[in-house]
Amino acid sequence: METTVRKQKKNLEMKKPSIYSLQLHEMQDWLKEQGEPKFRAGQIFDWLYKKRVKNYEDMSNLSKGLRDKLSNSFDITTLNTLVKQTSSDGTIKFLFQLYDGYSIETVLMRHEYGNSICVTTQVGCRIGCTFCASTLGGLKRNLEAGEIVAQVVEVQRALDETEERVSSLVVMGIGEPFDNYDNLMGFLRIINHEKGLHIGARHMTVSTSGIIPKIYKFAEEDLQINFAISLHAPNSELRSKLMPINRAYKLPDLMEAIKYYVNRTGRRITFEYGLFGGENDQVEHAEELAALLKGVKCHVNLIPVNYVPERDYVRTPREQIFLFEKTLKDRGVNVTIRREQGHDIDAACGQLRAKERKEETR
């Protein structure tokens, strides 16, 4: 059963940088420029990420002079919640308004092991996957690091009401994370830091459609973050049909980058494989996929796709999903079927935002 809470849009105007975009060392540098001791950075982070205050006046252990400097330099407002949809399984989807009127989606998913959040990195997407609602309308702009951080802060504030916490996160919302690489990395470091929300690196997952140069760069980062590839096809011809990015970053080159990442980090990689009825879900596709992944330290996550009205793809029948899984397992592939959540709300990535855009143009 769906429960929806809808609020009015606000006139938001952010002329100053978001304070949520600053890493701890950047806050320390700013304080030094202001003639303030750098230990104040830890106090400020405590107010932002532990107490989660909404204004500078509540930072009672800071001098009024420092609070004024912060107010004059950084915006502390986060996001305006436009829509909050709650599913019968506890999944909550948020539609947040940004300062310039654009909207983004964030999803809270409840598991036996804790609460997971799926965050967005861009307003729209330029990748053009033919099955995805996120790319409808194209890319509007990148999110700043602080706008990605603010999604987690806002969801955590909602969980504070029931004394729960965000225990893990996936960067699989609207947009291509590696298309906004610097802001992505700033976000991850803020969220991971012990003075931030302190979500462990191994409890975070970043997914990419396959921007190869950034895969090599990501392999050199010092964060032990889980890594996933949106694959969705076992060969170049089919992948190019489903994901036009494959024409720029071809599958053989992508597999080489993935092998480099696995060898460089020693970490297992996850391949996301959405199943589209009659397109990529036959036994021969599973056999071809097993051959493609042979020798790669990996896990395959099979995704029964959500129906998107603007797209032509249909869901693979349940029996066919199990057959596809069995075919992979019989060939030694580590595979699971992703548990569906939020099926009774607009839980497919980009659906709620697309619906909101339609209502605005009526």
From Swiss-Prot:
GO terms for cellular component: cytoplasm. Coiled coil: none annotated. S-adenosyl-L-methionine binds at residues 175-176, 207, 230-232, 306. The active site is at residues 105, 349. Residues 111-344 form the Radical SAM core domain. Keywords: 4Fe-4S, Cytoplasm, Disulfide bond, Iron, Iron-sulfur, Metal-binding, Methyltransferase, rRNA processing, S-adenosyl-L-methionine, Transferase, tRNA processing. It is found in: Cytoplasm. Binds 1 [4Fe-4S] cluster. The cluster is coordinated with 3 cysteines and an exchangeable S-adenosyl-L-methionine. [4Fe-4S] cluster binds at residues 125, 129, 132. It comes from the Bacteria. Its cofactor is [4Fe-4S] cluster. GO terms for molecular function: 4 iron, 4 sulfur cluster binding; metal ion binding; rRNA (adenine(2503)-C2-)-methyltransferase activity; rRNA binding; tRNA (adenine(37)-C2)-methyltransferase activity; tRNA binding. It is an enzyme of class 2 (transferase). Belongs to the radical SAM superfamily. RlmN family. Specifically methylates position 2 of adenine 2503 in 23S rRNA and position 2 of adenine 37 in tRNAs. PANTHER family: 23S RRNA METHYLTRANSFERASE, RADICAL SAM CORE DOMAIN-CONTAINING PROTEIN. Reaction proceeds by a ping-pong mechanism involving intermediate methylation of a conserved cysteine residue. This is Probable dual-specificity RNA methyltransferase RlmN. The gene is rlmN.
